[in-house]
């Protein structure tokens, strides 16, 4: 062991020794922190892979259940009526089994593709315990895209325009129509 002869030498030797220990301690901390970061990244990647696999399995289950429900509802709709055409894909609401058309705010809009006089369309809807749609009920909703140019309850065609239009000759003109049934 070396013994310094003056205070200056003693300080420099002691400082060098302390400085060396500090460097070794800092290097150990850096290594430990680096290892901890690597371990946390590996754990994060494993958890993301696991969660992705779980979500893929759940998505496949939901899609197959949804596909089966749509197939069942389409088969029921085809069996119930041969002259009706469903105007949209089967609606997934609580009334899906009893509405073979567009469901909106408690009403079922059933599309009839056969051209009828206004009186015949109104009578056909009455036999089904339903009515022709009111223009005011559908004008500001997404339904207007479907019911446009069909018979309205006032005997005129339902149109997007709000300008005055010529009254239709309901004794001769034929149109497609919707019957609106209130769902319970």
From Swiss-Prot:
One of its GO terms (cellular component) is virion membrane. Residues 1-33 are intravirion. It is a single-pass type II membrane protein. The chain crosses the membrane at residues 34-56. Residues 57-184 are virion surface. Glycans are attached at residue 134. It is found in: Virion membrane; Host membrane. InterPro entries: C-type_lectin-like/link_sf, Chordopox_A33R, CTDL_fold. Keywords: Disulfide bond, Glycoprotein, Host membrane, Membrane, Signal-anchor, Transmembrane, Transmembrane helix, Viral envelope protein, Virion. Residues 98-184 are annotated as: C-type lectin-like domain. Forms a complex with OPG162 and OPG190 to coordinate the incorporation of OPG164 into wrapped enveloped virion (EV) membranes and, subsequently, the production of actin tails. Therefore plays an essential role in efficient cell-to-cell spread of viral particles. Homodimer, disulfide-linked. Interacts with protein OPG190. Interacts (via C-terminus) with protein OPG164. Interacts with OPG162. Belongs to the orthopoxvirus OPG161 family. This is Protein OPG161. It comes from Variola virus (isolate Human/India/Ind3/1967). The gene is OPG161.
């Amino acid at each position: 062991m070396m013994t310094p002869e003056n205070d200056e030498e003693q300080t420099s030797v002691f400082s060098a020794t302390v400085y060396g220990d500090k460097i070794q301690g800092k290097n150990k901390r850096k290594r430990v922190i680096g290892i901890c970061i690597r371990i946390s990244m590996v754990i994060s990647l494993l958890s993301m892979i696991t969660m992705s696999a779980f979500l893929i399995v759940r998505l496949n289950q939901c899609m197959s259940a949804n596909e089966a429900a749509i197939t069942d509802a389409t088969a029921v709709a085809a069996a119930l009526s041969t002259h009706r055409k469903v105007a949209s894909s089967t609606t997934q609401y609580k009334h899906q089994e009893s509405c073979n058309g567009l469901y909106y705010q408690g009403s079922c809009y059933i599309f009839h593709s056969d051209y009828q006089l206004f009186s015949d369309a109104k009578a056909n809807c009455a036999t089904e315990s339903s009515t022709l749609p009111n223009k005011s009920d559908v004008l500001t909703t997404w339904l207007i895209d479907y019911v446009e140019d069909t018979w309205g309850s006032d005997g005129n065609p339902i149109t997007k325009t709000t300008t005055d239009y010529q009254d239709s000759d309901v004794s001769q003109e034929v149109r497609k129509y919707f019957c609106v049934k209130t769902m319970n």
